[in-house]
A protein has these predicted regions:
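Beta-barrel outer-membrane channel/assembly domains of diderm bacteria
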Residues: 3-133, 153-160, 164-166, 199-203, ...
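Short catalytic/ligand-binding loop motif for oxyanion handling, primarily in non-cytosolic enzymes
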Residues: 83-85, 138-140, 174, 294-296
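Internal, well-ordered domain-core segments that constitute the primary functional module
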Residues: 128-200, 204-206
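A conserved mid-domain beta-alpha-beta active-site/ligand-binding segment of alpha/beta enzyme cores
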Residues: 208-212
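Short, catalytically relevant binding-site loops at active-site mouths
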Residues: 213-214, 250-252, 290-294, 371-373
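Short glycine/acidic-rich loop motifs that flank beta-strands on beta-rich extracellular proteins
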Residues: 216-219
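Long, well-ordered mid-to-C-terminal structural blocks that present hydrophobic/aromatic surfaces
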Residues: 263-313
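Flexible glycine-rich, low-complexity coil/linker segments exposed to the extracellular/periplasmic environment
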Residues: 299-344
Length: 439
């Protein structure tokens, strides 16, 4: 009899714990888009390259499991991120090794299903702690942001309008593990940062300071990188006008060779300013951005940084063709002696834009942009990236469903031909239409 009671008690405990777990609140949100793109040229040099046209889609789902008011598990995953009918990428693609550019999964996994986030959020009396794979490499405005998941431990504490933050992130690990046997020790990329932000009714301002240590290549070439950065920003609203600005300043050793003692220093600056006047039916705005180029290609100071360490980032996409990461991700690099990877680098950028909302559901916009290089990559080369005119129409079909049609035309500059000055460039244009569902 006692044994039966113990069995019943054990079953009761299992049921109790199971019921508690099943009672956790689950909240889902996300978006789905399906789009079609036509790009007239895949090469910037005259008489080279062809056109391309295709459809593509992605489903992104965020799920939050609320275990208690102060404790939750948060996940995010992407499903069927692929071009319709296109060949699937080789599962052994290099992204299997380092992950897709904006995902914790590989390109092959994203074509099926890839989890990007899985982390615990605990709101304690001394601050909010988050532990696990979560968003990183994004701060302030969208300028120079890369929004990529990383394994991270983060802390944030809010009092009044002030938020204090600190985190440590593992961006890459090449030390020996069960999945990858290597002879290297301490071969990884780590990032440490502290930040503070103040929020008020009309805006916010903050500053982040970080230290990035890249020792991933020490087993191949005996050097490492140690980069420091400071990123102040502000976003403020003055009546109908919204202004945002950000400064990115990086310094340190881009390459520090342990064997020879050689050091390549980094000293680079980026500036971003944007203003938008929203007058109800009409709006107008402008953008200025600057990213330093290298003053002297043969000295021991790099003023331009790297494409990932001092660039416009993938989140900031001011045009449909020029400096647009999404276009590059789906249609690929626009080839030339200097390829266009869709990321602003070594450039001055200027844009003016206007728009009208004839009815609440319809937004018609147009922008004119111009960019030129800050410094020459080769003696005597031209600096102009080109002029671009973009026209877009966004129509809100329902509260959760919208349709966008955009046309961009690029008067290609001669920068892309590099030092091959005998080549002629060719203009390019793009047409995109996109259906987006949010939930």
């Amino acid at each position: 009899m006692k044994r039966k009671l113990l069995v019943l008690l054990a079953l009761g405990l299992v049921m109790a714990f199971s019921t508690s777990a099943l009672a956790a609140d689950v909240k889902f949100s996300g978006n789905f888009y399906a789009a079609g793109m036509y790009q007239d040229k895949t090469y910037s040099i005259k008489d080279y390259g062809n056109s391309t046209a295709f459809y593509y889609q992605r489903l992104r789902v965020r799920a939050e499991f609320a275990v208690s008011p102060s404790l939750s598990l948060i996940t995010r995953f992407d499903v069927m991120e692929r071009a319709w009918g296109a060949p699937r990428i080789d599962p052994d693609n290099f992204s299997t090794f380092i992950g897709d550019v904006d995902s914790a999964g590989s390109i092959s996994e994203n074509e099926n299903i890839a989890f990007d986030w899985a982390y615990i959020r605990y709101a304690s009396p001394i601050g909010v702690f988050t532990v696990g794979y979560q968003e990183d490499l994004a701060w302030g405005t969208k300028f120079a942001d890369w929004s990529r998941p990383a394994g991270k431990i983060a802390w944030a504490y809010n009092f009044g309008g002030v938020t204090l933050m600190a985190d440590v992130a593992k961006l890459l690990e090449l030390s020996s593990t069960a999945k990858l046997q290597t002879p290297w020790t301490d071969a990884d990329i780590d990032k440490y940062s502290v930040a503070a932000k103040y929020t008020w009714k009309g805006g916010e301002a903050g500053m982040q300071v970080f230290y990035l240590r890249n020792a991933a290549t020490r087993g191949i070439a005996d050097f490492k990188s140690e980069i420091y950065g400071v990123i102040p920003y502000a976003i403020a609203k003055f009546g109908p006008i919204t202004v945002e600005a950000e400064v990115d300043y990086y310094w340190g050793n881009l390459a520090d060779d342990d064997t020879t003692g050689y050091k390549l220093k980094m000293d680079s600056l980026g500036i971003y300013i944007d203003a938008l006047a929203d007058l109800g039916m009409f709006y107008a705005g402008g953008t200025f951005a600057y990213l330093a180029g290298d003053k002297n290609l043969i000295d021991d100071i790099n003023n331009a940084g790297t494409v990932t360490m001092m660039a416009g980032g993938k989140d900031w996409m001011p045009c449909l063709i020029m400096f647009n990461f999404d276009r590059t991700y789906w249609a690929g690099t626009i080839d030339a002696p200097i390829p266009d990877f869709g990321i602003m680098y070594n450039a001055w950028f200027y844009q003016g834009r206007v728009g009208v909302r004839p009815i609440p559901a319809l937004d018609l916009g147009a922008s004119l942009s111009y960019a030129h290089a800050d410094k020459e990559l080769f003696p005597g080369m031209k600096k102009d990236y080109g002029w671009e005119l973009d026209v877009t129409a966004n129509y809100k079909i329902t509260n959760n469903l919208s349709y966008m049609l955009g046309v961009g035309y690029l008067w290609t500059g001669k920068y892309w031909r590099g030092d091959e000055t005998d080549l002629d460039v060719q203009d390019n244009y793009l047409v995109i239409n996109k259906l987006t569902l949010t939930f």
